UniProtKB/Swiss-Prot annotation:
Changing H98F: About 1% quinol oxidase activity. Fe(II)-heme o binds at Y288, H411, H419. Binds 1 copper B ion per subunit. Binds 1 low-spin heme b per subunit. This is Cytochrome bo(3) ubiquinol oxidase subunit 1. GO terms for biological process: aerobic electron transport chain; aerobic respiration; electron transport coupled proton transport; respiratory electron transport chain. It comes from Escherichia coli (strain K12).
Length: 663
């Protein structure tokens, strides 16, 4: 009746796991108790869990990302500690099978459930505001996409206490991920968490692609869009083009494991290299899905805090488009050593070097934006400057790895680990923190505490270099990745330095948590009354902070690239409209969370081979979707009186701030 599931699936014999599970359960119970104590369940259901408001969904994405960052970083600390101990001749505190699960879960969590939700959260929060839209093209799909992401998060975390996670590495190469070498449920947890969350990401890509192309404000041509919107558009093109590859690849691996097919096994005509080609044909565009939007974040911040127009807008846009195209013809650089031949390796090595050119164009554009600007060293700007330095180092090591001869020496070494953390942390993570700092007042109506923000930045950037520069040296010294036992003692000093860097990063994360707490506590002292705390240039700053649920009472007409800056220059930024009209808006829907609940049941049942429960979960998903499809009560009109009330409150705050007509 319960398939493979039994009490033996709970790892009672592993104290680290059991303590972690106890902590998660106690934390969850405390949260439920607080919500119940304050009587907030109805509020949460009506205003957040069933919301189709892009801003609230963006905030929820970012909350999920921050929570999972804590989980993913805990894995990182354990890995660094284990390697430091193992290189000193100790056995360490992690048995090999547990260590292997940790490095797999760390990669999966950080890419799929930290970086992706954070980037998509920023897109949700900002893109409709930047283009003058009232919501995304498909509001319900936006809600459903979020909940599919949550399904993946739930399954990954359940694997901690029920069964195990994959021990294969984050991309689950066969034959190790095949049923012969991984007969347990670990790879199945990997499969279903990625497959279900991947559906949500694909829907997000379609949603934002349509939103940006079809819902821009009057007068906003493509080359009047903010750079962040351009970067988001290109990232969503990549999502639409690449995520179906992941879906099909994982589906074929599922068939190998569940039905005994042989797509990726060498016997019966299969080929494991086909899997590796397919997974990286998705995997390398995925890197740019993450990095392109944060390039847009840095573009917005550099212009705002340099107090001048963005340098080289057109070249920035075309560089973004070039990266989007080139990202599909570099994937083989992930496996130069696997026998493709010299000509093939040379082609992909050259394309990898070429893709560095548009990235370099962007870096020089940001530098020239700052040149002769009146730079304000706000914490968002510090993250940007830190990114330029850190990402440049990572980019140069990437070009080095693009040389097949060098890659043969460094493949699967800690040099590679240092390189991709250099670009992911120095690029994506720094960009997400910069974007959170920059747009926090827009989301919540008050600014983040600067003192703690700067402390977080310095701990992060110093910790990063202390943690990862030794790994470059260890890579040259011959240390390969994913070692947990019997590590050469000559590596001990470098591994201890790297572990101390991880501790500094932990302090940086602590500073970020304290920053949010202090900012919420002191929010009344840091209110943003005008909606424009930084002297912004784009349309999101034309609304109140936080914006009303309809975003714009009157959809703005765009005449210049820096639309809001132009309004301020002409003295039109805060003019009261002559009249308002009713606004057409979507209604909230609980169908998304219900479909997600059934999806979680379906995924869990498939992992444990509980076939009757899988049928219940799948049927529940389909029936809910069909019922939702016949629901025609999906929208309403906001009355003029409500709009006037909210807008008058905003104009009163503007008057308090001493602003009038944008001057």
């Amino acid at each position: 009746m319960f398939g493979k599931l039994s009490l033996d699936a709970v790892p009672f014999h592993e104290p680290i796991v059991m303590v972690t599970i106890a902590g998660i359960i106690l934390g969850g119970l405390a949260l439920v108790g607080l919500i119940t104590y304050f009587g907030k369940w109805t509020y949460l259901w009506k205003e957040w869990l069933t919301s189709v408001d892009h801003k609230r969904l963006g905030i929820m994405y970012i909350i999920v990302a921050i929570v999972m960052l804590l989980r993913g970083f805990a894995d990182a600390i354990m890995m660094r500690s284990q390697q430091a101990l193992a290189s000193a001749g100790e056995a360490g505190f992690l048995p090999p099978h547990h260590y292997d699960q940790i490095f797999t879960a760390h990669g999966v969590i950080m890419i799929f459930f930290v970086a992706m939700p954070f980037v998509i959260g920023l897109m949700n929060l900002v893109v409709p505001l930047q283009i003058g839209a009232r919501d995304v093209a498909f509001p319900f799909l936006n809600n459903l996409s979020f909940w599919f992401t949550v399904v993946g998060v739930i399954l990954v975390n359940v694997s901690l206490g029920v069964g195990e996670f994959a021990q294969t590495g984050w991309l689950a190469y066969p034959p190790l991920s095949g049923i012969e070498y991984s007969p347990g449920v670990g790879v199945d947890y990997w499969i279903w968490s990625l497959q279900l969350s991947g559906i949500g990401t694909t829907l997000t890509g379609i949603n934002f692609f349509v939103t940006i192309l079809k819902m821009r404000a009057p007068g906003m041509t493509m080359f009047k869009m903010p750079v962040f919107t351009w970067a988001s558009l290109c990232a969503n093109v990549l999502i639409i083009a690449s995520f179906p590859i992941l879906t099909v690849t994982v589906a074929l691996l599922t068939l190998d494991r569940y039905l005994g097919t042989h797509f990726f096994t060498n016997d019966m005509g299969g080929n494991m290299m086909m899997y590796i080609n397919l997974i990286w044909a998705w995997g390398h565009p995925e890197v740019y899905i993450l990095i392109l939007p944060v390039f847009g974040v840095f573009s917005e911040i550099a212009a705002t805090f340099s107090r001048k127009r963005l340098f080289g807008y057109t070249s920035l846009v075309w560089a973004t488009v070039c990266i989007t195209v080139l990202s599909f013809i570099v994937w083989l650089h992930h496996f130069f050593t696997m026998g493709a031949g010299a000509n093939v390796n040379a082609f992909f090595g050259i394309t990898t070097m070429i893709i560095a050119i548009p990235t370099g164009v962007k870096i020089f554009n940001w530098l020239f934006t700052m040149y002769q600007g009146r730079i304000v060293f706000h914490s968002a700007m510090l993250w940007t400057i830190g990114f330029i330095v850190t990402f440049s180092v990572g980019g140069m090591t990437g070009v080095l790895l693009a040389v097949p001869g060098a890659d043969f020496v460094l493949h699967n070494s800690l040099f590679l680990i240092a390189h991709f953390h250099n670009v992911i942390i120095g690029g994506v993570v720094f960009g997400c923190f910069a974007g959170m700092t920059y747009w926090w007042p827009k989301a919540f109506g008050f600014k983040l505490n600067e003192t703690w923000g700067k402390r977080a930045f310095w701990f992060w950037i110093i910790g990063f270099f202390v943690a990862f520069m030794p790994l470059y040296a260890l890579g040259f010294m011959g240390m390969t990745r994913r070692l947990s036992q019997q590590i050469d003692p000559q590596f001990h000093t470098m591994l201890m330095i790297a572990a101390s860097g991880a501790v500094l990063i932990a302090l940086g994360i602590l500073c970020l948590v304290i920053q949010m707490y202090v900012s919420i506590r002191d929010r009344d002292q840091n209110r943003d009354l005008t909606g424009d705390p930084w002297g912004g240039r784009t349309l999101e700053w034309a609304t109140s902070s936080p914006p009303p649920f309809y975003n714009f009472a009157v959809v703005p007409h765009v005449h210049e690239r820096d639309a809001f800056w132009e309004m301020k220059e002409k003295g039109e930024a805060y003019k009261k409209p002559d009249h308002y009209e009713e606004i057409h808006m979507p209604k909230n829907s609980g169908a998304g969370i219900v479909i997600a609940a059934f999806s979680t049941i379906f995924g869990f049942a498939m992992i444990w081979h509980i076939w009757w429960l899988a049928i219940v979960g799948f049927a529940g998903m389909i029936i809910t979707w069909i019922v939702k499809s016949f629901d025609e009560d999906v929208d309403y009109y906001v009355p003029v009186a409500e709009i006037e009330k909210l807008e008058n409150q905003h104009f009163d705050e503007i008057t308090k701030a001493g602003l009038k007509n944008g001057n």
